[in-house]
Structure formats: structure tokens, C-alpha cells
């Protein structure tokens, strides 16, 4: 059962006020991916959890302000609310475990950089924004990305200060 609309509306607004386009139906998801064949896009799987509120959504805002390199489009689906749209989105992420919050940077219709929940939990928005900026600068341009362009955040910068017993709930 989806979360109540009135509960998630402020969480949606945190991204839409930044110009992130919402995809609420499977048809909207398919149309976005059809259009993405020749461009770059950042897909955000939004969530009600604390790490989305404190880290993921603020990281999008910080990353947008931190660089001149940007994906052609910023898109989002809301896990726990837009259930069918989220399910369809995950079909485009075959082989990548489902998690939320979540980021995937696509280039020419293919995911080239992924930030899973386990890369968000325990890390602050500034660090996550740096990860996104690094990906934007590598993949969002006319030039081919470098051979050593990252595909995920550097695990050595994940979860600094967390106890060794910490387990992500992904």
C-alpha cells in the first residue's frame, strides 16, 4: 500500500523545486527512457527514509550548484508511493539490486554510474554530492568518458565514522 500523498508531497517538492521531473506512471518512465537514448540523465529513486531526507535529496541540490557539468535531464520516481512507476524504472536497472534512495546516471540509455542506499547511509550530503559531481564531470559532456571513469562511489569514502558492526538495510 502506498504512503499517503500528503505525507510525501513535501519530500517530492524538495526535488521538483530543483527542476527534477517526476515520473509517476510506467508510461512516463518508458517515454523518459526512450528519449534518453541520445542524452544523459540522472534518475533519483526518492524515498521517505531519513537518509533520503538528510543526505540524498540535499546531495542533488548541492551537486547541481557545484559544477557546470550536468546531465541533460534530472528525473525521479518515488518508491513507496508511485509503485508501478518505480517497478518499471527498476526494469531498466537489470542486474542492479533495488534500493531507495538511489541514483543512477545514464548515458545513451545505459546506466554508467550508480549510487545505492549503502553508498548513502552514513555519508553526508556533501560527500554524496562530490560523488555525483565526479560522475557528471566524467559522463556529462560531448567527449567520451575516460577509461577509468568511476561507476560507483569510492568505497573507501563510504560510511566514515560508522562502527564496524554497521549493516546497510538495502
Curated annotation (Swiss-Prot):
<dbReference type="InterPro" id="IPR009474">
    <property type="entry name" value="BrxB/BrxA"/>
</dbReference>
<dbReference type="Pfam" id="PF06491">
    <property type="entry name" value="Disulph_isomer"/>
</dbReference>
<feature type="region of interest" description="Disordered">
    <location>
        <begin position="140"/>
        <end position="170"/>
    </location>
</feature>
<comment type="similarity">
    <text>Belongs to the bacilliredoxin family.</text>
</comment>
<dbReference type="GO" id="GO:0045454">
    <property type="term" value="P:cell redox homeostasis"/>
</dbReference>
<protein>
    <recommendedName>
        <fullName>Bacilliredoxin SRU_1493</fullName>
    </recommendedName>
</protein>
